[in-house]
Amino acid sequence: MFCTINQKAVQPAKPSDTTTPQYPADFFNKNNHQKPTVRVTQRGYKIQELREIISNGIVQDDLNSHHVVRYMELIMEDITDTLDEDWNSFGVKIGRKGDKITPLSLVNVMIEEDELIDGKRNNGVNKKDDKWIMLVITSYYRFAFSQNQNHRSNLITKLNLQLRTFLKDPPTIVDNMGLFTSLISNINFTKLISALDMFLNRFKNNDWSYLRFGTIASRYKDCSALMSLSHVCDVTGMKMEEFMDWIFVYSTGEDMIKLMKEGNEIDNPMSYMPYTMSMGLSTKSPYSSINCPSIYSFIHMLGSFLGSERSRNARMVSENNIVNLKVNAGVVSYVKSHRASMIKAFISNDVKEQWYNNDDNDNENGGDDESDEELDEMPKGDNPVEWFMYLESRHFELPEEIKNFMNREARKITNPRVGTIGKFVSTMN
């Protein structure tokens, strides 16, 4: 820009304190494809001593994260299963077919000497109690990330019911966010939780698979933008390529490029990738709604118009470019509500030959039917290119029919939660 006051060129800039997100592939490339490291202290403790300390700590609602990490490491040494094929991720050789591995096979464990931290003990426990002790401490991880108090209370109720299957007179677990957050503040605790979940995700029939009640929260942590892609495909019935064809907003396209960055194994369910944040592979997730707000808002506005409860309850994380996102979402939701994509999945053998002959004739003689359509008329099909050209011819001003559709759907949203996309959509005029 040129300033008319001082007759000098001015370079526009705005302040930014944002951290650059790191992709999981970057972590492994920088660390020579080594496994994530877990540091375990309290080496001098044996399993029975920790069993007594932690069981008492659960009853007293007072746990030390260093005790918990050492205890988990000792328990996880004995959680085993056998690979039915090679397991590799980001160049890390986790195991070969036929190998018996443990959750600790996913990380590099470094056990360190330090001064032992004392703790009160419960002498009435033995190896059989490990099942319920592990259930409690892994559940604490999930509770720590449940910000909604009602949801957290429901989870705690479910845990207390599960404990009755292990003990005749189990301890009653209460809501103690101070305790929960103190555990997750220890990165080695979260790494062990992640390794355990990654292992149990692979071996779903393992005897310890019930622990995923708590560990599941480590999978795809801070990946809400990426996970919303699966959601929009489910709601609309579109494949990913079809959905991408409907992106008409620049910032949404930029976010899609971030999410689809190659080499990060997002399509490999057995990868380290779902544990990018919980395993400490990144300090800022590239797949979060904060890093990709446009795609996240677009998808959940679209879902809200189409009646998705999940979308209506999604948090409103940003208002950047919100007007264009609303228009894009309104168009796609209108088309998907009024232009169904259907096929004749089955035909009788009697008409099979006639069916394919007619189909061939349609392909030869059709295809140009809509090319003569006037640009001032709404497309009759669901071709995103035709819809974009139609909107472009109107300078992207929505026709009244689509505006009315959006207003009707917005009025159907009753009692939306404050701070949600559903609340934003419901207040549209």
UniProtKB/Swiss-Prot annotation:
Coiled-coil annotated spans: none
Sequence segments annotated as region (Disordered): 355-378
Q: Name one GO molecular function term.
A: RNA binding
Sequence similarity? Belongs to the ephemerovirus nucleocapsid protein family.
Q: Which GO terms describe its cellular component?
A: helical viral capsid; host cell cytoplasm; ribonucleoprotein complex; viral nucleocapsid
Function in brief: Encapsidates the genome, protecting it from nucleases. If expressed without protein P it binds non-specifically RNA and therefore can bind it's own mRNA. Interaction with protein P abolishes any non-specific RNA binding, and prevents phosphorylation. The soluble N-P complex encapsidates specifically the genomic RNA, with protein N protecting the genome like a pearl necklace. The encapsidated genomic RNA is termed the nucleocapsid (NC) and serves as template for viral transcription and replication. Protein N binds protein P in the NC through a different interaction, and can be phosphorylated.
Q: Name one Pfam family in it.
A: Rhabdo_ncap
Species name: Adelaide River virus (ARV)
**Record's subcellular location:** Virion; Host cytoplasm
Which protein, by its recorded name, is this?
Nucleoprotein
Q: Which InterPro entries match?
A: Rhabdo_ncapsid, Rhabdovirus_ncapsid_C, Rhabdovirus_ncapsid_N, Rhabdovirus_nucleoprotein-like
How does it associate, per the subunit comment? Homomultimerizes to form the nucleocapsid. Binds to viral genomic RNA.
Q: Where is the composition biased (Acidic residues)?
A: 359-376
Keywords (A to Z) from UniProt: Capsid protein, Helical capsid protein, Host cytoplasm, Phosphoprotein, Ribonucleoprotein, RNA-binding, Viral nucleoprotein, Virion
